[in-house]
Structure formats: structure tokens, C-alpha cells
């Protein structure tokens, strides 16, 4: 993935390299970097507005309405009272946090009839982009003469931090300096961070998650993947902590909502915050991703999710607690499966090797050997030498850091003992995790994860807990060891842990927690991870240097071609058209779906396709009102916009900058898109904004929200 400087310096996994050249109109473009070439192509596709209507330093623009929702999604401001539309799966954690067995908003949905009924969501934030400024010269000027890549990265991070500090951001702003274009350029970015965010409306999961894991990444799609929140501000309309006295935020700009629909080949544009892509990855990097990251992830998550699913199916309270965690895990699990299939189907490794041969020919014919001569060979060497460590780290991360939860809990517990000054923050984080945790379920997960670790990691790299405890005291029986941990440790149990914390002073607590079985396990796992990381880092720096030089070389090789920077969860736009596609020979997928498909798919015996009767009746009677087009209600649509994870909730705009949908997924046939964009196959799946309004109006009976919007 595209790595930030701090991730490179602190990361626990190998970094990836770069290759591949995207066409000028296929990319995730920085709005402040759009040029005449981009505009000409946008005009050709049907765009009608001036460029500064998208992003401007000195006047309101569409970018002012697009937000980072939570920690990894996008949202769009749609009213002058801070109303935000995003995806249901983006709001899923917030919906779950407010759900109980008696008030199950995941199952039944949530409708606030007044602003007073809107529910505050502790910990949820919304970020508005304030400005983005290129600072490449200021950073690069401090890097001259540094030849060691590790030192170069450290110095770059130091300079970036200094530039961010000089911005004098207040406590309600986030100021960062990010590397772009494979660490060849740098931009300073400032966000306003709003922390009073309230839940306004959520459809039932039978709508917002219709199709479940079966339909995830698939087309045709009939998912009403949306939820509604509101941003509140202080009396001065600036960000403020939650207060009952706060008022709805008055945004600089909000999006108008189109009721006009779309047809095939109409202009479509997304703006959002894509998380990471690897479009310049080399063939060796692609092999590494498949063998040493995706394959381990598929294996581990499949086993973990099977254990979770069985427990969730048997008990409603467990389902609520684990719903969000399961969805997040399964999403990336299925993505990895689809990515591997797509990479093979499209022969991406073969394409990358052809690109590498072209790069090598350019170097030879243009006398560039002194600068770029060893770039490809150094990348090949680094990937091959680092493959073993990367695979081991992925297995360790997926099993004991990301599989069983008790190891992470123990890390928090140990941090309380070793960082008493940060006591309140650590304890709050731990308590937040306790709310959605079942020790009895994790007791089943732990031995399954330990068994995978033993099978997949060499004996000399295993955490020493295997040799010293599991083998010595339990004769290798991981189930008996897991029972021991959960019987003797206080860490998995909120009540026991808090009782211990309250009954001891800091010194006694530190001594006691050090001997806790879960903490001993955690320390052993961390030590093993550090040893593997040490093996990985030398190759990681070599890969990072190769990436930087390879991209710089590509820019020289193609001087007249705009090469978009890989995604790094900063604001990007993508322009394209409404289009269906051919998934396989002899088949064609239409560019939109309708309510007819909901009735065809619905199945009361399936937890993924069951829909409440009162919703089905709306489809049966075709009670669509003004939201219909030719007597049908459009549910979802396709466009060839370029998106990835992080774009969830991104607004889809028409040629006039009006909202026509919310992006929520990509298609199964193009899961390789983070590495190789395939214009004939890759599609963005979006929920039609008219279906969103239909659910708010006809099902939710919430006209106050419709009245807030600017409908055109």
C-alpha cells in the first residue's frame, strides 16, 4: 500500500514497490493539481463547470462539502444545517454503538423525528478540508546530499513535522504534511475537525446491507447503502466538543441533489478520500502481494470469521457486538480473494514485466544508467530477499494481532502499567473495546490462531511462548493453553480488570499485570514481531528507494503524460461516465438496477436477503412517488470512476456538480484495480440518490430531512 513516512519508520510489514502507467483520464486526481489536459478530457465527457468550482483557495467550491467521515470513509454535506450523507457500512459502527437487544437499530433502522432526537456518537468525527499547499521545495531543500534512504526518510519526516507545527493549527484542526508521487513531492494539508456528530437516520440492515457477504463486491446490486448524520458546531460555527447547546454546522458549501437521474454515457464524477493504491507496483511486488499478503489473509480470516459467524448466528447479543468487526474483516477478506483472481485473469504480472522491459530500454537508449540503471534490479532483489519476512509478518499480524483480541487487550493493559501519565486515554480505549467483546468467543479463536502460527511460521521465528509455555507446560495443546489464559488472566474481563486496577497502587499493579498470562503472551508476540521486522526493514528501505526513483524515471520517460499519485487517504477526484460492462464473453450487465430486483432476490429464510414486509410492500405497490423514473425505482448504478477503499460514501456528481449517488463498492471482476486499472472492466457501484430519498420519505416518513435538501 502507499505508505506514509511515519508508517515506513514504524511499520510492522514490508513496503511495496512501484510500476504501471495509468492513462491520463484514469486516475485519482488531486483537485489542486488538475490541469488543462484533465479539463479537456472532462469537457469531452460532458463536464460543464469551471475548474475552480471543484476546488478553490478563495471561494466556496464543491470540495468544501466533501468530508472525511470517521477514520476511513467519505461523506457529503447536503444541507445548510450540516446534514451528511454517507454509506450505511461507514455508519455501521455508530449504528451498532447505539443498538441494544431492545433497541436494535442495526436490524430495525433509526429515524429521528426532530433534531432533539438525533443521537450523539462519542468518538466519531468529521473532517473538512481547509487547504492544501505544495511544499515540495521546502522539504526537498533539506534532503540534499543525503544518500542513505533510511536517513532521507527520517529527515523528511522531521521537516514535515516542523512545517506542520509552523502552521499553528488550533486544537480543532489537523495539520499534516504528506508525501505524494512516491515520495517525490510533498503537500501541507489542513483539516477542520468536528467532534460533535449525531446520527440522524439509518435504514434497516435489510436495506443498508441487503445481500450481505454474498453480494459484497458483486453486480447486479440492490443495496441501499446509506446513512445520515449531522455535524454540530459551537456558537461561533467552529468545531467544538459535544454540548447540548451546540448548533447545526453552517457549511461553506453544500451539494444540490439531482432528481433528474442519468443515462448511459452521461458524465459522472466522484470526489472522496481513497485510502491506498499501488498502481506503480512492479511484477515482483505483485507476486509479493499475492503470495505473502493476500494468501495468508484469506486463510486466517476465513477461519476466524467461521468461528465468529457460528456464534453470531446462535445469539442475537453476540451478533450485535460482533456485527461491525465481522463486516470489516469479511470485506477485506473477500477483496483479497477477488484481487488474486483479477490479477491472474488480467495477467497483470505479464503486463508489469512488459512495462519493466520498456523502462529498461528507455534507460539504455537515453543514457540514464547512472541515475536509474539499478532501480529494477534493486527492487527485484529487495522483494525476493524480503518475501519470507513479509509472509511471516502477515501471518503474525492476522492471527495474534488481528485475529484473537486478547493480545491487543493485553497490550493496552501493559501500556497502563508502563505509561501511567497516559492512564485516562489508554483506559478509555480499552473500555471502548470491552463493550464489543466476548471472552467466551475469543477463547475459541485463540487456539485456532495459535495453530496457524505454528504451521506457517518457522520454529526459530515463533514467539517463545510456544517453547516455554505451550509445549513445555501443555504438551503443545493450544486449546488447553487458551483455557489457561482465559481462566487465569484478568485482562479479558472488564470487571476483574477494573477491580484489580482499583485495588492496587501503580507499582503493585505494574508487577501484577506483568505476570498475567495474557500479558506474557502479548509480550512474546511483540518480541517475535520485532525480530521479523528487523529482518524486513533493510529490504523495506531498498524498496522505498526503488519506488521513488522508478516513479521519477517514469516522469522523465513520459514527459507529456500526467501520472496521478497513488492514493493515500487525501482528497481526490475521478471523472468518467455512466457505463455497464461485459463481465465475460456473451454477457452484458446493464448500468443500473431497479426495485424489481429487490423482490426477486428477497428471501425470508436468508439473513442476508430477508426484508421487512412493510418495505417489500412499498416495492410491490410501486409506491415510488416522485422518486421513480418511467415507473421504476432505480436502486444502484455503475460508472467507470476510479475509486478504492476510503471512497466509501463518496458523492457521485453529474456534469453540473449535482449529487446523483453515493459510491459504496467496486465490482468483483476488477478487484485488481488497486494495482492495475482496467477501463473495460472496472466499475464503481453507487446507490442512486433517489433511492436514498425514497427510503427517508416513504419508509422513514421523515419529511423534515427532505425539506432540508436543495432538490433540482
Curated annotation (Swiss-Prot):
What keywords does the record list, in alphabetical order? Aminopeptidase, Cell outer membrane, Coiled coil, Hydrolase, Membrane, Protease, Serine protease, Signal
By its UniProt entry, which SUPFAM superfamilies does this protein fall under?
Trypsin-like serine proteases
Thermal behaviour (record text): Optimum temperature is 43 degrees Celsius, using Ala-Phe-pNA as substrate.
Coiled-coil segments on the chain, per record: 136-173
According to the UniProt record, activity depends on pH as follows:
Is active against Ala-Phe-pNA over a broad pH range, from neutral to basic pH (6.5-9.0).
Q: Provide the Gene Ontology terms for cellular component.
A: cell outer membrane
Family annotation (Gene3D superfamilies) = Trypsin-like serine proteases
- Where is the major localization of this protein? membrane
The EC number on file is 3.4.14.-
InterPro entries from the UniProt entry: Pep_S46, Peptidase_S1_PA, Peptidase_S1_PA_chymotrypsin
In the UniProt record, the signal sequence range is 1-23
Q: Any idea which GO molecular function terms this record carries? A: dipeptidyl-peptidase activity; peptide binding; serine-type aminopeptidase activity; serine-type peptidase activity
Annotated active site residues, numbered on this chain, are 89 (charge relay system), 225 (charge relay system), 648 (charge relay system)
Q: Name one GO biological process term.
A: peptide catabolic process
| Protein family (similarity comment) | Belongs to the peptidase S46 family.
Physiological role: Catalyzes the removal of dipeptides from the N-terminus of oligopeptides. Shows a broad specificity for both aliphatic and aromatic residues in the P1 position, with glycine or proline being not acceptable in this position. Most potently cleaves the synthetic substrate Met-Leu-methylcoumaryl-7-amide (Met-Leu-MCA), Leu-Arg-MCA and Lys-Ala-MCA to a lesser extent. Is likely involved in amino acid metabolism and bacterial growth of asaccharolytic P.gingivalis, that utilizes amino acids from extracellular proteinaceous nutrients as energy and carbon sources.
Protein name as it appears in the record: Dipeptidyl-peptidase 7
Q: Corresponding gene?
A: dpp7
